[in-house]
Amino acid sequence: MLSPQRTRFRKQHRGRMKGISSRGNRICFGRYALQALEPAWITSRQIEAGRRAMSRNVRRGGQIWVRIFPDKPVTVRPTETRMGSGKGFPEYWVAVVKPGKILYEMGGVPENIARKAISIASSKMPIRTQFIISG
């Protein structure tokens, strides 16, 4: 699963997901892509599940590019713990995704295969997405 090798700080604020994605909203590498339509945190497990689903469907042909990276730590408190006594420990990593962000790209395969693979990957995502074609 994806996670940063080292970070400057162990814990981060939760932040807000306002507006639409201004970066990473165009197809750069492949011909087909999966684009987010809603804001969300996407975990490294979900990213990996989508990638595996796509690569299983495409077999040897074609290439897949993952355009998001989980660089935000999410902290979790132990269960049945009283309030206070600091922030919890980092439990998992998420990628902050805004509407318009490209999640995956694919190339080197026919459109019908790409559409099928990307639809399976989209079912692994916790948000609404759309299939787009470059050009």
Swiss-Prot record:
InterPro entries: Ribosomal_uL16, Ribosomal_uL16_bact-type, Ribosomal_uL16_CS, Ribosomal_uL16_dom, Ribosomal_uL16_sf. CDD domains: Ribosomal_L16_L10e. It is found in: Plastid, Chloroplast. One of its GO terms (molecular function) is rRNA binding. GO terms for cellular component: chloroplast; mitochondrial large ribosomal subunit. It holds the Pfam family Ribosomal_L16. Belongs to the universal ribosomal protein uL16 family. NCBIfam families: rplP_bact. This is Large ribosomal subunit protein uL16c.
